[in-house]
Amino acid sequence: MLEPFQILSICSFILSALHFMGWTIGHLNQIKRGVNLKIRIRNPNKETINREVSILRHSYQKEIQAKETIKEVLSDNMERLSDHIVIEGLSAEEIIKMGETVLEVEELH
């Protein structure tokens, strides 16, 4: 049986991870918006447009990879910690689903 302090520590860790994940996703979205706003092509030609599209595609792929990595890390940690977390009325699967829901909500913003 876990001590109340241990339970609080685990819950605190999960909340910190969720906060960090939300901040990171928000920060990546701001970078993406900033990149989109800074692109102004003067005298566009096919080469310039292709280069700018390539830069945007690369930035977007990096953002998606970062989100997937965060999701994997959180999911792994939630699965490990769910065996030790007891929230009255919630199963381990429901706790993991809560973490995934937070990720989905953050992705929408």
Swiss-Prot record:
UniProt GO BP: proton transmembrane transport
Keywords, sorted A to Z: Coiled coil, Host cell membrane, Host membrane, Hydrogen ion transport, Ion channel, Ion transport, Membrane, Phosphoprotein, Signal-anchor, Transmembrane, Transmembrane helix, Transport, Viral ion channel, Virion
Transmembrane segment boundaries: 5-27
Predominant place of localization: virion
Site (Seems to be involved in pH gating): W23
Keyword Magnesium: no
Coiled-coil positions: 59-83
Cell location: Virion membrane; Host cell membrane
Ranges of the Intravirion topological domain: 28-109
Family annotation (Pfam families): Flu_B_M2
Keyword tRNA processing among record annotations: no
Residue intervals annotated with topology Virion surface: 1-4
Membrane topology classification: Single-pass type III membrane protein
Site (Essential for channel activity, possibly by being protonated during channel activation, and by forming the channel gate and the selective filter): H19
GO molecular function: channel activity
InterPro entries for this protein: Flu_B_M2
Gene Ontology CC: host cell plasma membrane; membrane; virion membrane
PTM characteristics: Phosphorylated by host.
Extra facts: Influenza B virus genome RNA segment 7 encodes the M1 (AC Q71UK7) and BM2 proteins. Normal translation produces the M1 protein. The M1 termination codon overlaps the BM2 initiation codon in an overlapping stop-start pentanucleotide 5'-UAAUG-3'. Termination of M1 translation triggers reinitiation on the BM2 AUG in the +2 open reading frame.
Subunit organization: Homotetramer.
Function: Forms presumably a highly low-pH gated proton-selective channel. Trp-23 may function as a minimalistic gate that opens and closes the pore. When the environmental pH is lower than a threshold, the BM2 channel would be activated and selectively transport protons across the membrane from the extracellular side to the cytoplasmic side. Crucial for the uncoating process.
UniProt name for this protein: Matrix protein 2
Gene assigned in the entry: M
